Amino acid sequence: MFSDAPILIAEDNLYVAPDLSNAVEDMDGRVVGPASTVVEALSLLATRAVAAAIVDCQLADRDAAPLARRLAERGVPFIIHTATAVPRLIGDLHPDVPVLIKPLQSSAVLTCLLDEMRKCAVFK
């Protein structure tokens, strides 16, 4: 379904990150990451092509606001997948970004990501 699209996974949970990675690969996507910190995710975004992203709003080093900002600046569709409340800064700057609350099956997360990619014309 992802047709070899590179999908950035920014997730610091040791169980969720590999589960999402496997699910992306099972749906013919290429995993970029997973990144457990904002610094790592921004580095990957600077050096790798990314078609879309799944972002936990609280990573190991800080909240993901800088990553969300950079993704939006580049026009990369993304979704928030979190177990905590979305930080106000992310919610205020990106009110239209879907927020999925953990726990949630990976298939539901990826269905939502595909919908966002279609809205942004990454897939038609």
Residue ranges: model-predicted function:
Residues 1-6, 39, 90-91, 101, ...:
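Non-catalytic signal-transmission and effector/linker regions of two-component phosphorelay proteins
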Residues 14-33:
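Two-component/phosphorelay signaling modules centered on CheY-like receiver
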Residues 34-52:
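Acidic, metal-coordinating helix/loop segments flanking the phosphotransfer/catalytic sites
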Residues 55-72:
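Conserved phosphotransfer microenvironments
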Residues 97-99:
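Conserved phosphoryl-transfer motifs of two-component systems
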Residues 46-48, 69-76:
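Conserved phosphotransfer cores of two-component systems
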Residues 79-81:
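Hydrophobic/aromatic residues positioned on beta-strands within the core alpha/beta folds
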Residues 11:
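Conserved acidic carboxylate
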